[in-house]
């Protein structure tokens, strides 16, 4: 108990020294909130006496009493909890006697305090943001569903149109083939000695679209007229003017005529032979002609005439290469 008494008396002396120092310090400044220096000294002394009675249980903070551009006033003696400061929240409302005065100041940590209205507006805005996002997502889903349904309807309509066009074209192809079969009957031409049958015309199948159907009928009628004009009285077909003037067609015609003449000669040599017999005969003839050419070259040369009997017996000793070198 004696130690506690000594400690309380020591604290009382410290409080009195701080109170005297603060009275001297604050007396030199003007009070911005309308308070006088006498009032502040009175409050400080009252605060000091109250603290000395509580045995140091309530400490006077130096930060709240320092002059930082706003009013530093002490609470009344009747209230016990207004002197405590929070470490995170600094208020800017202070009671001077029975009157209250609001002083605009920044926080001790350097952060500015926002009014309650702006805090409420920000809270409402943050609450409304998810609602707006939900509405936008629902609108986008509805729009995508509408577009997908439109695309499906368009695809179905295009498929139906394609099927209808295919059905029409198939019907027209069937009709054209029937007309060609009717027109492709056998035609007979009379000769001086008798009648000769001509080959029936093959049915022509043509597919045309809706726009080309009208022009196709006229084109077929023109072709029938040209074919009828090309038929001669003797039954021989004559080439049209365009084919007659083409040089490739003339060359092909002459080549066919030559081949036919040679085949007739071979048929006379082998009257009852087939195509295989004629081909083998031609190969043997070619080999015999080559043998004769070799014999003539060997016998006509002064250096190689002695090899003629060896080549005659069918031995290949590379004489063909030597003969080619000599001729060069």
Curated annotation (Swiss-Prot):
It is found in: Nucleus. Residues 243-292 form the bHLH domain. Residues 145-248 are annotated as: Disordered. Pfam families: HLH (PF00010). The keyword Transcription applies. Keywords: DNA-binding, Nucleus, Transcription, Transcription regulation. Residues 220-229 have a biased composition (Basic and acidic residues). One of its GO terms (molecular function) is DNA-binding transcription factor activity. It comes from the Eukaryota. One of its GO terms (cellular component) is nucleus. Homodimer. Belongs to the bHLH protein family. This is Transcription factor bHLH84. It comes from Arabidopsis thaliana. The lineage of its organism: Eukaryota, Viridiplantae, Streptophyta, Embryophyta, Tracheophyta.
